[in-house]
Amino acid sequence: MIQRISHITIYVLDQDAAFDFYVNKLGFEVNTDATMDGGFRWLTVSSKGQPDLEIALMPTGPGPMRDQETSDMLRALIQKGALGSGVLETADIHKTYEELKAKGVEFSQPPTERFYGIEALLKDYSGNWFSLTQRTEASAKKPK
């Protein structure tokens, strides 16, 4: 029986830039940063509040899992923002929004009230977008 999700993958155009974004901008912690045989870099990070869920920052280049044509298509989709969405939760969205903006994080939407809480939208350096969300009392009353 499956017990939990241990890793998820986010495809990135440049692992060094992704390291800077997720660690230095978002404040995630590095779990693993290792170079394997053949030069493949295994880079995982996690949020401080959820260290047992690792995010693998996966390069898009060709290799054992994909050919050059597939790699090129994957890169194009990422750059258009068509892949890699997720929800990042915070207790104080307005404070976090201002802190991240001051660090140079690009937002496409400022904090906005929604039925599920307050949400702002941000992108990483590759083009992957995320919802930064704060739950509210109203968000506990979901529409049916």
Model feature map: region roles:
Residues 5-7, 82-85:
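Eukaryotic phosphotyrosine signaling hubs
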Residues 2, 11-61:
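Core segments of cupin and vicinal oxygen chelate
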Residues 58-71, 109, 113, 134-137:
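Acetyl-CoA-dependent GNAT
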Residues 1, 10, 33, 41-46, ...:
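Vicinal oxygen chelate
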